[in-house]
Amino acid sequence: FKYAWVMDNIKDERERGITIDLAFQKFDTPKFNYTLIDAPGHRDFIKNMITGASEADCAVLVLSAKPGETDTAIAPGGQAREHAFLLKTLGVGQIIVAVNKMDDSNFSEDAYKAAVEKGKGLIKSCGYKADEVPFIPVSGWMGDNLVKKSENMAWYSGKTLLEAFDDFVAPEKPTGKPLRLPIQDVYS
């Protein structure tokens, strides 16, 4: 969880192993300055995910290489399905799909390919061009392919997650249009 703990600062998040609230972290790459918005994936906190996604120019959708988890996530009512549709609906036009938990499948290329095949069907149904979306095998637990190439996945020759961020294209800002901003709560 060391990489998740960078963003999960609330005691409940660390104890339960899930993101509850939005967390923001700034970082730079050679091409862009980023503000990472870590949004919850759990269905109980979908309002927080929508708030974060409404501010995003691009996103990382996370699927699992662990057998059965991607099937559940992309099925009707599944969280990955809901998040993918919400991202597209909220105008997030560019995504990367991180195939996580590669360590749970012993870094199996077959597990990765199975998740990619299912993931491509999902994102295509949401309106994304599946052939333009990179799928990157990662292990959040071990740190594989997040920042540096994984020695455990010699079969993968693509970019790391961090390297893939610089393939995003900066969206044109609607500076000549009326102001729009997300509102999460109203207090009286």
Question: Model features per residue range: what roles?
Answer:
Residues A4, I20-D21, A39, R43-I46, ...:
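Amphipathic alpha-helical transducer elements in NTP-driven molecular machines
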Residues T19, K26, T35-L36, V60-V62, ...:
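Structured core elements
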Residues F1-K47, A56-E69:
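P-loop NTPase switch module centered on the Walker A-proximal segment
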Residues G52-A53, A59-E132:
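Conserved C-terminal guanine-recognition region of P-loop GTPase G domains, centered on the G4
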Residues K113, K120-S188:
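Conserved catalytic-core segments of large NTP-driven translation/proteostasis enzymes
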Residues G41, D103, M142:
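Short, glycine/acidic-enriched loop or turn micro-motifs at the edges of active sites
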Residues G17, D38, M49, V60, ...:
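Residue-level signature of catalytic and energy-coupling elements of molecular machines
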